[in-house]
Curated annotation (Swiss-Prot):
<dbReference type="GO" id="GO:0016702">
    <property type="term" value="F:oxidoreductase activity, acting on single donors with incorporation of molecular oxygen, incorporation of two atoms of oxygen"/>
</dbReference>
<dbReference type="Pfam" id="PF02900">
    <property type="entry name" value="LigB"/>
</dbReference>
<comment type="function">
    <text>Component of the 2-aminophenol 1,6-dioxygenase complex that catalyzes the ring fission of 2-aminophenol to produce 2-aminomuconic 6-semialdehyde. AmnB seems to be the catalytic subunit of the complex. The enzyme is also active toward 2-amino-p-cresol, 6-amino-m-cresol, 2-amino-m-cresol, 2-amino-4,5-dimethylphenol, 2-amino-4-chlorophenol, and catechol.</text>
</comment>
<keyword id="KW-0479">Metal-binding</keyword>
<comment type="similarity">
    <text>Belongs to the LigB/MhpB extradiol dioxygenase family.</text>
</comment>
<keyword id="KW-0408">Iron</keyword>
<dbReference type="GO" id="GO:0008198">
    <property type="term" value="F:ferrous iron binding"/>
</dbReference>
<keyword id="KW-0560">Oxidoreductase</keyword>
<dbReference type="InterPro" id="IPR004183">
    <property type="entry name" value="Xdiol_dOase_suB"/>
</dbReference>
<dbReference type="GO" id="GO:0009056">
    <property type="term" value="P:catabolic process"/>
</dbReference>
<keyword id="KW-0058">Aromatic hydrocarbons catabolism</keyword>
<comment type="subunit">
    <text>Heterotetramer of 2 alpha and 2 beta subunits.</text>
</comment>
<feature type="binding site">
    <location>
        <position position="196"/>
    </location>
    <ligand>
        <name>Fe cation</name>
    </ligand>
</feature>
<feature type="binding site">
    <location>
        <position position="14"/>
    </location>
    <ligand>
        <name>Fe cation</name>
    </ligand>
</feature>
<dbReference type="InterPro" id="IPR034943">
    <property type="entry name" value="2A5CPDO_B"/>
</dbReference>
<keyword id="KW-0223">Dioxygenase</keyword>
<feature type="binding site">
    <location>
        <position position="63"/>
    </location>
    <ligand>
        <name>Fe cation</name>
    </ligand>
</feature>
């Protein structure tokens, strides 16, 4: 019997400004820095990944939108240049990504068996979205861990929120089943911002941090309320408040990655570790981790079940 398991889950936001601020060699635009609090938060998350030693990273991004079904990348390797459609001045990134096609196919099949519409993406010239790329780079800049990339079907936007997030719950449970059968140790990445109200004019230069602050008072207050509940492990309350949070803070978790991740982890009522919080063009971004190894719910790397 396979002994796959989920070893940790992260809220891992994807503002391209973080890549721009870091100046990796893959990104053509160069900066003088900026958004340090969030970049330092990702440094702490990277240290956790290094300690966990996962076999695979699974990422759900709201910017790979598929209106019909949930799609999974089914190509071994993709390479090319990604240009952010909103911030081409900040993000022109040369990517090279290896995918775990076997696990992607298993997730696709488990989703189909659970009643979802699922599909494998086999186009060898497909260009991954900037959200997927940003999250993956910020969490593991070595790019040495295979990836399962999952699209956003966006059902919470065109069905009722309850129906849409219910479908994401099913997707999460199907993902878990595939991981358990795979024998692999997996980390889940919910590529989401929290409050998503944002500025409409960019400062010059973009990394002028004297211009960076929360766009709305209510958005910031909601972020702090939800983060504090997460830090206390009061996850039942988080999910009870989630619809109101989404409506009042325009929270990007509406796209479903947060629900998908927690459904896959069986909704653990565990205190989260906040690696850091900061705003990007006014939006609220938190790097948050639920480490199932530290909680005794998953094995340490190298230990038998």
């Amino acid at each position: 019997m396979a002994n796959g398991e989920i070893i940790s889950g992260f809220i891992a936001p994807h503002p391209p400004h973080l890549v721009y601020g870091e100046n990796p060699p893959q990104n053509e635009p160069k900066s003088t820095g900026g958004w340090e609090q969030l970049r330092w938060a990702y440094e702490r998350a990277r240290a956790s990944i290094e300690e966990l030693k996962p076999d695979v990273l699974l990422v759900h991004s709201p910017h790979w939108i598929t209106s019909v079904g949930h799609h999974f990348i089914g190509v071994d390797h993709l390479q090319g240049r990604s240009v952010d459609p909103i911030f081409p001045n900040l993000f022109r990134f040369d990517y090279s990504i290896n995918f775990d096609v076997e696990l992607s196919e298993a997730c696709c099949e488990e989703g189909r068996k659970a009643g979802l519409v699922t599909k494998m993406m086999r186009n060898p010239r497909f260009r991954p979205d900037y959200g997927t790329i940003t999250t993956l780079h910020m969490i593991r800049p070595q790019w040495d861990i295979p990836v399962v990339s999952i699209s956003a079907n966006n059902t919470p936007y065109y069905l009722s929120m309850e129906e849409g997030l219910g479908e994401m719950d099913v997707l999460g449970k199907a993902t878990r089943e595939a991981i358990l059968k795979s024998g692999k140790r997996a980390v889940l990445l919910a590529s989401n911002t929290l409050s998503h109200w944002h500025f409409h004019e960019e400062p010059v230069p973009p990394e002028d941090m004297s211009k960076e602050h929360p766009q709305t008072k209510i958005g910031y207050e909601w972020d702090m309320r939800m983060i504090e509940l997460m830090r206390q492990g009061r996850m039942e309350e988080v999910f009870q408040l989630l619809p109101q949070f989404i409506e009042e803070a325009f929270a990007e978790v509406k796209s479903g990655a947060f629900t998908w991740m927690h459904a896959a982890m069986q909704y653990p009522n565990l205190p989260a570790e906040l690696h850091g919080y900061g705003t990007v063009i006014g939006t609220g971004n938190a790097v948050v981790e639920w480490n199932l190894v530290k909680a005794g719910l998953a094995r340490v790397a190298g230990k038998a079940a």
